[in-house]
Amino acid sequence: MRLDKYLKVSRLIKRRTIANEACDAGRVSANGRPVKASYDVKQGDIIEITFGTRTVKVRVEAVAEFTTKDNAATMYTVIE
């Protein structure tokens, strides 16, 4: 699954276009490397997202095309 879609489905970022812009601006990295929105997310990846002065680091636990709002938080584990 593409990184921008994963960020939207898991509700880490509200809209896919914003996720795409964040990737283009270099504010998203996977496994320590800056990545594009087309990066293929795999289970076990470490994704780091910078929101202004705050940084969120998560481990990908599941990759699903669709999920409910209640189950979205089960797709990742917050590390920092």
Give the ranges of each region predicted by the language model:
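A basic, amphipathic helix-loop patch mediating RNA/tRNA/ribosome contacts
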Residues: 1-41
